[in-house]
Amino acid sequence: MEEKKRIMSGMRPTGRLHLGHYLGVITNWVKLQNDYDCYFSVADWHALTTGYDKTEQLKDNVYNVVIDWLACGIDPKKATIFVQSTIPEIAELNIYLGMVTPQNWIERDPTLKDMAKILKSKEGTNSQIGFGLMGYPVLMTADILAVNAHYVPVGIDQVAHVELTRDMARRFNNVYHTDYFVEPSPKLNNCPLLPGVDGAKMGKSFNNDIKISDDEETTTKRIMQCITDRSRARKDDLGHPDKCEVAFKYWQIFGTPEEIAQVEAECKAGKRGCADCKRQLAQKVNEHFKEIRERRKYYENHLDEVKAILAEGAEKSRAVSAKILTDVRNIIGMY
């Protein structure tokens, strides 16, 4: 049997995950775990790059991320789930990669620019980029090359983030006259982006998100805040689903083809008011997450199982990374 190709991806534990994470990342991981050797990391070192002074909730955030993953269908029997900081080999590999990476590569990397924006939004215009944040792209590459992954699942707007990893792998291979590291390719996820309730990009810091862990009441309240067709003043006004900034986009994701067609037709005919439409939408979303919430509650009440999954994942991941690091040290000629 042909050996499965390896996939590496991760998330920073900066708070509870929202529906954007669910649709944009997790549902794709659930599919990939069936056909690939998947490694999914809770990137707690990366969380420190912009949240180094706010670590009180870091451990709880790690558990909540993993619980969300498990509840949404990530299967520890199919995928390796681990916490980044439990794999010290990543940190050592980060050093070696940093030695061969030109400074201008780092400065132009979009990942660093994105992280700098996050830091600026938190600390204001006088914020200073720390050494750890400057090295974010190198550490991200170390995460990927520590398991010598073939693919990195990303959205179309993140393809450039993988290019630096490819450049670094190629640079290491050229410097040390080897072909050891795979140049990982982006594996595109074509899921449409889910906007926040205000129509902007969904994000925890924007207070426009709907969290995976939200209960029915909270989810309904948030969906009732969703922006619809701004030009529609009365219930019987003819609607324009194509101008419905949020609610109809949610219908297109959570509704059946028949339901979507009905919503569109009734809206255009002025037979469906926006408030009623959002109430029905909330029912659909709550129905979709019913089993996920039940599984989430189970893992919240069985945290020992979550810890055991992470321990097993760390052991498996370290076995792979330790072998790779030994090879890297030998290639470089370390003592």
Where are these regions (language model features)?
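Conserved nucleotide- and phosphate/pyrophosphate-binding catalytic cores
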Residues: 166-335
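N-terminal Rossmann-like or analogous alpha/beta NTP/dinucleotide-binding catalytic cores
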Residues: 2-141, 297
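A generic secondary-structure signal for well-formed alpha-helical elements
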Residues: 66, 73, 101-105, 149, ...
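A broad detector of the eukaryotic-type serine/threonine protein kinase catalytic domain
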Residues: 12, 46-47, 147-152, 207, ...
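Short capping/connector residues at structural and topological boundaries
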Residues: 12, 16, 53, 102, ...
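Structured ligand/cofactor/substrate-binding pocket environments in proteins
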Residues: 17-23, 39, 54-58, 77, ...
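Short helix-capping/linker segments at secondary-structure and domain boundaries
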Residues: 103-107, 146-153, 255-263, 293
